[in-house]
Regions:
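Glycine- and aromatic-rich loop/turn segments at beta-sheet edges
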Residues: 101-111, 183-200, 240-257, 303-304
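Active-site helix/loop module of the DD-peptidase/beta-lactamase fold
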Residues: 138-172, 223-261, 266, 283
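Active-site-proximal loop and beta-strand segments within enzyme catalytic domains
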Residues: 67, 77-79, 110-115, 119, ...
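Penicillin-binding protein/beta-lactamase superfamily catalytic region
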Residues: 198, 202-204, 229, 247-307
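N-terminal leader/targeting segments and the immediately adjacent pre-domain N-terminus
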Residues: 1-111, 138-142
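Active-site SXXK
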Residues: 95, 116-143, 167, 214-218, ...
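Solvent-exposed, acidic/flexible segments
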Residues: 70, 74, 84-85, 116-124, ...
Length: 307
């Protein structure tokens, strides 16, 4: 792991075997994995995934924010932690954490702890959007209706001159090209397979590429040092991350490639810090809060997919 310690994965004596689902560790929603397969998948996510790409930048605050606690027991949550793959449950109400539960040792707690770095998955899309809100509020980007016509790499692709809101809504019309996810870097894909591409109907299509383009576009707009400063301002000074939050590159050939993904890594408490910052912006009607309300108002039908 990142701190130099290691966990030796061993199958239980009664193991019925591990299904690796192709070796990636990702299990689709329609599968019914056994307990050993779930543990193996978690092991991959905790100990392999954080190291699978070059890191762009990491941030933690010198004076992290703290939480107030007024804990109560919840029998249903405890039961779910004992019988399902649920790893962690935090409930924040009226300015306090009122439920704080984690997987027990005899389930996944020998691997997963309060300091484990969770892979953001789809939450990374929300965090990316939150950063876009800050970019709009500091004037780096004009608005959600700004057209992506100032980045030469997008020329002669379906993304050129589209409004930013289309990519935020994952409705850029790229469904013909993104049915399967790719580990190839954004810059490489735009310069090769997307040259001459044409957009289809601007309807919702859940994929990673739109968001990876947005993070890499932020890197183009700010520059390397400028985007790292934005991370310092948002995660360090505003949210006041305690442990660490970092963003990896995606498909980079070397550590100098200027191509980003949207997969963040943070602890369970630091994800709550991020969520609380979003809630505070919304409730206080800050500039970023107004941005959040705008994209909520401009959301599009998802045909029952992804909520």
């Amino acid at each position: 792991s990142l701190d130099g310690t290691y966990f030796e994965y061993k199958c239980a004596d009664s193991s019925t075997g591990i299904n690796t689902y192709g070796g990636s560790g990702y299990i689709s929603e329609n599968e019914s994995p056994n307990f050993e397969t779930l543990r193996w998948s978690l092991y991959r996510k905790l100990h392999y995934r954080p190291l699978s790409d070059f890191r762009f930048y990491s941030v933690k605050a010198s004076n992290p924010s703290s939480f107030k606690f007024e804990l109560r027991e919840d029998a249903y949550i405890k039961q779910q932690l004992q019988t399902t793959p649920l790893l962690s449950y935090l409930l924040y109400e009226d300015g306090k954490i009122v439920i704080d539960e984690i997987t027990p040792k005899d389930r996944f707690g020998d691997m997963f702890t309060v300091s484990s770095m969770l892979h953001s998955m789809s939450m990374g899309k929300s965090i990316t959007s939150y950063l876009v809100g800050h970019a709009i509020c500091d004037g780096t980007i004009e608005s959600v209706d700004s057209r992506l016509n100032d980045w030469p790499l997008l020329e002669d692709t379906l993304y050129y001159n589209q409004k930013l809101i289309n990519l935020l809504n994952m409705s850029s019309g790229d469904s013909a090209y993104t049915q399967k996810e790719s580990n190839i870097a954004v810059l490489t894909r735009l310069a090769t397979e997307f040259k001459g591409s044409k957009k289809s109907n601007l309807q919702y299509h859940y994929a990673n590429l739109d968001t990876n383009i947005i993070t890499t576009y932020l890197l183009f707009k700010y520059g390397d040092s400028g985007l790292k400063q934005l991370f310092d301002d948002v995660f360090g000074k505003k949210i006041r991350i305690k442990n660490e939050v970092w963003l990896n590159k995606h498909g980079a050939v070397n550590r100098y490639d200027q191509t980003l993904g949207h997969q963040f890594f943070a602890t369970r408490y630091d994800y709550l810090r991020i969520a609380k910052a979003m809630l505070d912006d919304w409730q206080n009607d800050t500039c970023v809060g107004q941005y959040l309300k705008t994209i909520h108002e401009r959301r599009i039908p998802k045909n029952g997919a992804q909520g």
